[in-house]
UniProtKB/Swiss-Prot annotation:
Pfam families: YbeY. Its main location: cytoplasm. This is Endoribonuclease YbeY. Signal peptide: none annotated. One of its GO terms (biological process) is rRNA processing. Transmembrane segments: none annotated. It is found in: Cytoplasm. The lineage of its organism: Bacteria, Bacillati, Cyanobacteriota, Cyanophyceae, Synechococcales. The gene is ybeY. Zn(2+) binds at H142, H146, H152. GO terms for cellular component: cytoplasm. Gene3D superfamilies: Metalloproteases ('zincins'), catalytic domain.
Length: 177
């Protein structure tokens, strides 16, 4: 089983206070559930040789990544700086992996960072008629796939990515929909 070193930046107190249930509050302020779920997701992706999982990820023992849960203004600032889009977005991924990156035995592999807008996730959860916790998991799974070199330049690639996200979310977590 892979070891995950998660740098977790929780949501602000006002975003946590607005959460509807304890499970969602936990996801917004604690790293534990994320560490367990990311570990399971990455292990499943490493085992599935039919997907896009870089060889360096398949063979490493330990990796690190970050999750930051932000407000719309903060993610809009990042979106403007990195994508020249002056609006909030649901999730941004900042991948650290480069293709054919050499790996030293025993060295921790840095995947990158996933940044999620909690208010945007909340709006999308309402639109999709499911809970905020599920939407947060959906967005983090999407960000994780981007960190692992997945992309969606066309409809077929997007469909494959969305199907993989559904698979990851279906792996089992005690989530209220």
């Amino acid at each position: 089983m892979i070891t995950i070193d998660l740098a977790f930046s929780p949501a602000s107190a006002d975003l946590i206070d607005a959460a509807d249930d304890e499970g969602t509050r936990s996801r917004l302020q604690e790293a534990g559930d994320w560490e367990c779920e990311l570990s399971a997701w990455i292990e499943a992706l490493r085992q599935d040789h039919g997907n896009h999982c870089p060889e360096v990820v398949r063979t490493c023992d330990s990796l690190s990544l970050g999750i930051s849960l932000l407000d719309d203004a903060s993610i809009a600032e990042l979106n403007l700086h990195w994508r020249q889009k002056p609006t909030p977005t649901d999730v941004l991924s900042f991948a650290a992996l480069e293709s054919e990156m050499p790996m030293v035995a025993g060295q921790e592999l840095e995947l990158g960072d996933i940044v999620v807008s909690v208010p945007t996730a909340r709006r999308q959860a309402l639109e999709q008629k499911h809970g905020l916790e599920r939407e947060l998991r959906w967005l983090v799974s999407h960000g994780l796939l981007h960190l692992l070199s997945w992309d969606h330049p066309d409809e077929d690639a997007l469909a494959a990515m969305l199907q993989k996200q559904e698979h990851l979310l279906g792996m089992g977590s005690n989530v209220r929909s």
